[in-house]
């Protein structure tokens, strides 16, 4: 990210904010660093709201723009969820407080998410480093208990997490570390939930 990108993103934030006073966070259009194609959801349809502004329930926080006043109202990202779903949880919390989130197609950011994208019919998944699966499984089980987390996200991610042990052997030859971190994530997701719930 260079100075020109920052200038453009701040300008876009101010422009979109004028049309949407309840804007919580604005992100760029994220492009796959390898293929230079936009990351998108096969399930959630695009909802453009204004010139170049795409309203979304959650965005990738990389390269995004947010004001300090918004952080005072919504709070900071939940560090208890390190490392996965942190930006998604913040966006859902913002929606709960009456704010909207979205991205602009006037700013683009080349960004590599995980190792590669896996296409699974109507769904897609990201192949990540083995250790990331610990946080994904643990945090998913924790977020299942959070009421403001969208039901569709819980259902689609439940399907992904259940299917992963079956299709990962076909996309990576080093499957054992993946299984180990998945099992650790499930264990801690169940046994440490009370600690997550009670720790502020």
Located regions from the model:
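Active-site donor/metal-binding and catalytic loop motifs
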Residues: 104-124
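A short acidic, glycine-rich active-site loop
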Residues: 122-134
């Amino acid at each position: 990210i260079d100075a020109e990108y920052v200038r453009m993103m701040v300008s876009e934030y101010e422009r979109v904010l004028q049309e949407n006073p309840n804007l919580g966070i604005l992100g760029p259009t994220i492009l796959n660093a390898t293929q230079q194609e936009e990351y998108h959801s096969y399930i959630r349809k695009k909802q453009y709201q204004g010139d170049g502004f795409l309203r979304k329930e959650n965005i990738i926080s990389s390269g995004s723009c947010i004001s300090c006043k918004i952080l005072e109202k919504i709070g900071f990202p939940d560090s208890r969820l390190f490392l996965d779903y942190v930006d998604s949880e913040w966006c859902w919390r913002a929606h709960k407080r009456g704010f909207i989130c979205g991205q602009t197609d006037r700013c683009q950011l080349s960004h590599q998410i995980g190792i590669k994208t896996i296409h699974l019919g109507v769904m897609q998944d990201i192949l990540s480093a083995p250790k990331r699966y610990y946080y994904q499984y643990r945090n998913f089980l924790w977020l299942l208990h959070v009421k403001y987390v969208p039901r569709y996200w819980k259902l689609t991610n439940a399907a992904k997490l259940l299917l992963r042990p079956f299709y990962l052997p076909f996309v990576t030859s080093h499957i054992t570390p993946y299984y180990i971190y998945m099992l650790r994530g499930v264990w801690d997701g169940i046994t440490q939930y009370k600690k997550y719930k009670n720790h502020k």
